[in-house]
Amino acid sequence: MKMWLQRFLAIAGLTTLEALRQPLLLLLTTSTVVAISLMPVLLMYTLGEAQKLVQDSALALHFLCGLLLGGYAASAALGREIRRGTLTSVLSKPVERSTFFLAKFAGVAGMLALFSIATGIVTLLAGHLAENSAPAVSILLYTAPFAAFLLAGLLNYFNRRPFVSTAFVLLVVFLTVVFVFAAVTGHVAWRLLPASLCI
């Protein structure tokens, strides 16, 4: 049982790491975060229905981009293994098929969980910003992607860290910091949390 768990965690961790290094993940996550965060500004003049429109649009975008990202990551994870020939070598060793495919699924699910954390945080903040004005939260929310990219670029230049995975993780961390700041100051639309968790 212990060996099975070690193999499972090793394959799932490598799958998550490979998925985090895909440029499409960073591109889709950043564009989703920016689009959701700009929705309160773009949909400002809707005669009192701005909050509902922002909430529905943000949840729909969260679902659609998560679906596209999950499909791409799952097909890319298995496609790479088949093209490289590592699938046959892994399955010829004492790794069962069910363990391999469940670990691949868990790795893709881990990457999607990070994506959902980022877009869920932005959805909660955008739902509140559509109703109430919070300039400090808005500024922090709009600068989080740029700060993540800038710091990831510096880490890539000086420490040779991979840009895509570092920028993605920093984006999630910076959005979490903005969320904590907004929660402390009372600028979070908590009623969107169950819907965001269902997605």
Q: Can you name each region flagged by the protein language model?
A:
Residues A12-T16, L27-T30, A58, G71:
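Residue-level signal for short hydrophobic patches within transmembrane helices
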Residues M1-L26:
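Aromatic- and glycine-rich beta-strand/loop motifs that create alpha-glucan
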Residues L17-R21, L59, G79:
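Alpha-helical membrane-interface segments at transmembrane helix boundaries
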Residues L27-T29, V90, A118:
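Short, hydrophobic secondary-structure boundary micro-motifs
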Residues A77-A109:
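Helix-loop-helix units of permease transmembrane domains in multi-pass membrane transporters
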Residues R21-V34, G107-V108:
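Alpha-helical transmembrane segments of integral membrane proteins, especially early/N-terminal helices
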Residues I36-A77, F101-I199:
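Secretory targeting signals
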